[in-house]
A protein has these predicted regions:
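Auxiliary Fe-S-binding modules of radical SAM enzymes
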Residues: 1-13, 19-20, 193-275
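Active-site beta-loop-alpha junctions enriched in small/polar residues
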Residues: 88-90, 121-123, 143-147, 184-186, ...
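Short, electropositive alpha-helical surface patch
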Residues: 99-102, 137-144, 191-208
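Surface-exposed amphipathic alpha-helices with a cationic face
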Residues: 107-110, 133, 169-175, 259, ...
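Active-site glycine- and acidic-residue-rich loops that bind
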Residues: 118, 123, 187-196
Length: 275
């Protein structure tokens, strides 16, 4: 059966729109959807939100259709702060084209001119460039895990291609919207090839910074990763087992090497996320 026909899409009502964020640089989190159909094997959102539903993660999405109304009220009441859009979901996954929850939330934010930071691995963010560009304080982050689209298809089967994301970065630059790159999680044996060319393009389109993130083996991640590795790259299983049970020196060196490649490409601000 085609995945498009297996996806369960539901509408739900949220109790609140904004939650306090513990992420650096963010005051609030806004997640227009629950679940995500990008089906990234390394996703740790199910563990973060303590998901225990019957549906397989990646096969369902719930649209929080009342979020824009709730948000309009909360923006009037809460202290002003930076809103991180898409901290445990992708705000521009395919469901957004039908529901436009993210877009309608942006419309409310624009009225109050609150600062935002969007994170996505979808090129569909470019459809809202007209709205985003009207905000005085904004930033958009695009996620990458590899320069190789074949490897991307293994790990992120239903996300935008590498070339589509690069075009999105270029479109953001052309619109004058500050953009950064979230490179991660770093996947041993899969992340290294072609990075010089990838980072050179990112420097060319003036990304503000690159954040290099580590692979976090939250509950459920290894269970999704292992079958893919066993089928495609069984030689890499020991490296992932090592990361699963700690942070070995060679993995830390890999993170440092990737950060160094980004700096050598001309990106001045490069940070490796802490464990």
């Amino acid at each position: 059966m085609d995945k498009e026909h297996r996806i369960k899409v539901r509408e739900i009502s949220a109790r609140t729109a904004l939650s306090r964020s513990r992420l650096s640089g963010l005051d609030y989190a806004l997640n227009p959807y629950r679940g995500c159909i990008h089906a990234c094997l390394y996703c740790y959102s199910p563990a973060v939100i303590h998901y225990d539903g019957a549906d397989k993660w990646g096969d369902f999405v719930e649209a929080r259709t009342n979020l824009p109304v709730l948000l309009a009220h909360e923006l009037r009441k809460l202290p002003r702060g930076v809103i991180g859009i898409g901290t445990v979901t992708d705000p521009y996954q395919p469901a957004e084209r039908g529901y436009r929850v993210t877009r309608h939330c942006l419309e409310q934010i624009l009225r109050r001119q609150w600062p935002i930071c969007i994170q996505t691995k979808s090129a569909a963010v470019t459809e809202d460039i007209g709205l985003i560009s009207q905000l005085r304080e904004k930033e958009v982050g695009i996620t990458f895990t590899t320069a190789d689209d074949t490897l991307r298809a293994w790990m992120e089967p239903d996300a935008s291609t590498v070339s589509e994301r690069l075009k999105a970065l270029e479109a953001l630059k052309d619109a004058g919207i500050p953009a950064f790159v979230f490179f991660g999680p770093v996947l041993p044996g899969l992340a290294e090839e072609g990075l010089e060319r990838l980072f050179a393009f990112m420097a060319q389109v003036s990304v503000t910074r690159v954040l290099v993130d580590r692979l976090r083996m939250h509950p459920g991640v290894w269970e999704r990763l292992r079958p893919c590795l066993a089928a495609n790259r069984p030689d890499l299983l020991p490296a992932y087992e090592a990361v699963r049970f700690g942070s070995p020196e060679d993995y830390e060196q890999l993170l440092a090497d990737i950060a160094d490649k980004a700096r050598r490409a001309g990106i001045s601000s490069v940070v490796v996320e802490r464990p």
